[in-house]
Amino acid sequence: MFGRSKMKRTFSTGLAYVFGIAFAAWGVVLMEKADFGVSMAVAPAYLLYRWLSPAWSFVTFGMEEYCLRAVLLLAMCLLLWRFRVSYLFSFVTAVVYGFVLDAFMLLGAMLPARSVWLRAIYYVLRMHFCAAGVSAMFHTYISPEVYELFVKEVSAHFGADINRFKTGYDCVSCLIGVAMSFLAFGLWHFEGVKWGTILCALINGYVIGRFSTFYEKHWTFCDRFPWRKYFAPDAAAQTSAE
């Protein structure tokens, strides 16, 4: 999985996929524990979870995540006006991520959160874990979770900078979260959408970009298994031609 290539270590794209899911899920747990506001990307799912779980105990945060990702995947296909079988693997990733998130939520329940300073530490760690996870997913050919896939595919389709596009996407998600909070919990009641959400929306794209720069400076991402053609057929065909 690791090696050396031109003064940089090589890093498996498959391992980047695993780390991406784990880091992002743990970052969300820390974010929920900090209680300064969830990230804009997960705000809609979190609000639905908080709204529905008191009435239906089987509803989990992870479940709402992959249900909403299915809707986002459909919206992406309509926007790009194309469908690939590899996109279905993004939904599989969303389901895997949902189960990992629910498992980590059980672990996170044991973390103390009595002081505001400890919660602040959780918030800072959360931002770094989530950014590291999202950036890792951007460096793997395995279909990322639908949220990352949407940012990656739509920004490429329209020729937009991926980090700036993500910041814009996050801001829109933040506004949707605020609207959902008002509808579900009452006007001017900010449930799950707080100052931490706004701060995250403004700087998350930048932090992810810094992690990407760090990764690319120290590692060369390479495939250890011949599976790229099943997930990125266009890239595989181009590589073969070269």
Question: Where do the PLM segments sit?
Answer:
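Core subunits and conserved enzymes of cellular information-processing
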Residues: F2-E242
